[in-house]
Amino acid sequence: MTSRSTEKSAAANPAAVSKTPSPDRIRRAPKVLLHDHLDGGLRPGTIVELARETGYGDLPETDADLLGTWFRQAADSGSLERYLETFSHTVGVMQTRDALVRVAAECAEDLAEDGVVYAEVRYAPEQHLEKGLTLEEVVEAVNEGFREGERRARDNGHRIRVGALLTAMRHAARSLEIAELANRYRDLGVVGFDIAGAEAGYPPTRHLDAFEYLKRENNHFTIHAGEAFGLPSIWQALQWCGADRLGHGVRIIDDIQVHEDGSVKLGRLASYVRDKRIPLELCPSSNLQTGAADSYAEHPIGLLRRLHFRATVNTDNRLMSHTSMSREFEHLVEAFGYTLDDMQWFSVNAMKSAFIPFDERLAMINDVIKPGYAELKSEWLFQQTASTSGSSESDG
């Protein structure tokens, strides 16, 4: 049904190489993150310290560097069992109020240090109740941590705003309860709802009561779909459940045909997703780990960007994928020859798709994102001009 598109890399496009942003400019560029799991982004050192403080004794390593390596190797192992084990350890140390506050604060700090100016970070409150916390106490602790992290970032000269997405697990039966929780805290730091977990055997239609409730309440939600299970999960998420965004959505490529002459034909579902501007929360490094693509150069994001889908770049699980927003863009710059213009396109796409009011999204685009990229482009142009001038004088 589909033919994969392999976009040209920067190495095959010499004209683009001179415009390739440096790692430093990529880091300083204002970036927007829509798909990041709180329990997938802890600092290894924090895990070790929290395990000691909370009495969690199941860590595979107690040295922070060795533990970080273990997480990366487990995630890259190709074993679903080992991959899921990584989350048992992060969630295992996130069972107290103080731990949740700390993890959320450090998350905001780390993202801000990486140049992220707006982020929506998701977590499942139902997974943090083992030591007696209530759902409400979990949400309030995480919100407190995000606000503390924003303050620390400001003190360090960085600007970031973090909103929470409350996630319900697909295999459980608490989605309506979590949706109601998201609605109660929607003006107190929570910006939307999500469902996550194994797609196969747990279609989003099992949680229709939660989605129907959220639609009645005029609330926002995204659904993990089209990561592993393919087009049926995307179709159900959109047409049965009414999702505002697609968590991953990378398998929409299965409904796109690329012919030998380079022409492209979109199927009905792919056309609908593009025409309706449905945001795709693409996570390149994570997709490589799960087998959705064999390399960055073969990742569908190249074709989806060329076809003007509402594509966004995300991290998914920063610890497990050993990644950051800057690293994701570095990989894409190398694979596709992307410039600061491309980075701005992805960042504006993401900001347009955020679950905050229109005027606030517009202000972020016009007051933060566009000026930030304009400054970096001017800086690059000045350096290019100075370099050319210096070369001419030398030749003379």
From Swiss-Prot:
Cofactor: Zn(2+)
Entry GO CC: cytosol
Residue span of region Disordered: 1-26
Active site (record annotation): E227
GO biological process: adenosine catabolic process; hypoxanthine salvage; inosine biosynthetic process; nucleotide metabolic process; purine ribonucleoside monophosphate biosynthetic process
Catalytic activity: adenosine + H2O + H(+) = inosine + NH4(+); 2'-deoxyadenosine + H2O + H(+) = 2'-deoxyinosine + NH4(+)
E.C. numbers: 3.5.4.4
Note describing how the cofactor binds: Binds 1 zinc ion per subunit.
Function: Catalyzes the hydrolytic deamination of adenosine and 2-deoxyadenosine.
Name of the protein in question: Adenosine deaminase 1
